[in-house]
């Protein structure tokens, strides 16, 4: 299998062949990462924001990997590309109304409205309108307090409040 790595502008940075030590870790309401091990003949100038698209999801470098120079001609890499979940832990959750951005608020509504809040924040952070809500449980209105928390914490708080789970497939939040 060949894996294409792009810079944050979408330009091809490298094409690599991951070895058998490469893994994907993905859990409902948990970690989502792609650890890729490979050897190249040239050093690769990785940068934060480089990404790979794998099985319909985008995985992004949040730290720059350091190569191990195995010989004068070989470089061994083991970068860890993170799913959107890790990016959400770095993004403050805002109530986005009338151009205002409030990070300390409470919302009384059903699960769909709370998920809409998260999707709006993901689209804000990613600079897109690609993210959407998938199927949502039916439930009565409940109060969720967003007291200066990040989007990942907010998602977990919503799930706890409505006694359910969340997960992401592609650019859809369920």
Residue ranges of model-derived segments:
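Juxtamembrane "anchor/assembly" segments of surface/extracellular structural proteins
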Residues: 1-47, 79-88, 94-107
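A broad structural signal for short, well-ordered beta-strand segments within beta-sheet-rich domains
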Residues: 15-21, 60-65, 138-143
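Short beta-strand and beta-hairpin "edge-sheet" elements
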Residues: 52-82, 167-169
């Amino acid at each position: 299998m060949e894996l294409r790595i792009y810079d944050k502008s979408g330009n091809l940075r490298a094409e690599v062949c991951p070895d058998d030590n490469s893994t994907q870790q993905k859990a409902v309401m948990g970690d989502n990462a792609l650890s890729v091990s490979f050897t190249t003949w040239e050093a690769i100038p990785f940068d934060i924001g480089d990404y790979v698209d794998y099985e319909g999801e985008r995985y992004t470098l949040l730290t720059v990997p350091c190569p191990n120079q195995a010989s004068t001609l070989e470089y061994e890499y083991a970068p860890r590309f993170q799913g959107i979940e890790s990016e959400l832990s770095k993004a403050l959750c805002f109530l986005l109304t009338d151009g205002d951005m409030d990070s300390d608020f409470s919302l009384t509504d059903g699960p769909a409205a709370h998920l809409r809040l998260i999707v709006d924040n993901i689209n804000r952070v990613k600079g897109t309108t690609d993210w959407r809500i998938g199927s949502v449980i039916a439930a009565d209105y409940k109060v969720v307090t967003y007291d200066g928390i990040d989007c990942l914490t907010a998602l977990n708080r919503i799930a706890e409040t409505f006694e359910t789970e969340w997960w992401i497939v592609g650019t859809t939040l369920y």
